[in-house]
Amino acid sequence: MYEREVQMTKKKIAFIPIDNRPVCYELAQDIAAIDGDIELLLPPKWLLGDLKKNSRIDGIYSWVESLNEVDYLVVSLDTIAYGGLIPSRRSSETLTEIKNRVEKFIDLFKSKNAKILAVSSIMRISNNNINEEEKEYWSKYGKKIFKYSWDLSKDGEAQTDVPSEIIEDYILTRKRNFEINCCYIEYAQSGIFDTLVLSKDDCAEFGLNIQECRKFEAIIKEKELKNVLLKTGADE
């Protein structure tokens, strides 16, 4: 009787984080290191964004292009669509521009024949006048926009003295991000994404983000999508 030597092949997981913070980058490495059967592949840290700069999307595309024989692609969709979590709130790009970029990545992902596990954030609305992670006008109108969002969600109407062009910009940004997330749900429904997580960040009892969550819940229920999940927390 001959003893057969079984060689274990490590599962290769390519991970595109939401940005380069330790909780998104080093912590992922620490978690993967717990299981000796996992090989975690990450883009160079300098390609990823932070509080002050966007991710280098073209560089991340080239990195994915260079990958060979990966089993799983774990992807922050905010990174490939906007350049990160903060740019997803600040970006002035159109829905068409974002969709075209995402579709280019999707074609690349499909060519890797790997399971795709994707995460996208539902745009938050913070109750403060701090624009460090928001558009410039948040420093003056942040709390008022929060109240406008709260009242509109709670009562179906709202009054505000925030300039109409700022309200319009905010609503259009939310609508664009909502539509992109709807596209992601379609990718999950068609099987392109094996799993899609839509993450809720800094939620209050009422708000336009809460309305969007309810719409997503209704879509998921109507389409009976077991592979689309709504979870709390964007960084996690």
Where are these regions (language model features)?
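An N-terminal assembly and electron-transfer interface module characteristic of large anaerobic redox
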Residues: 2-236
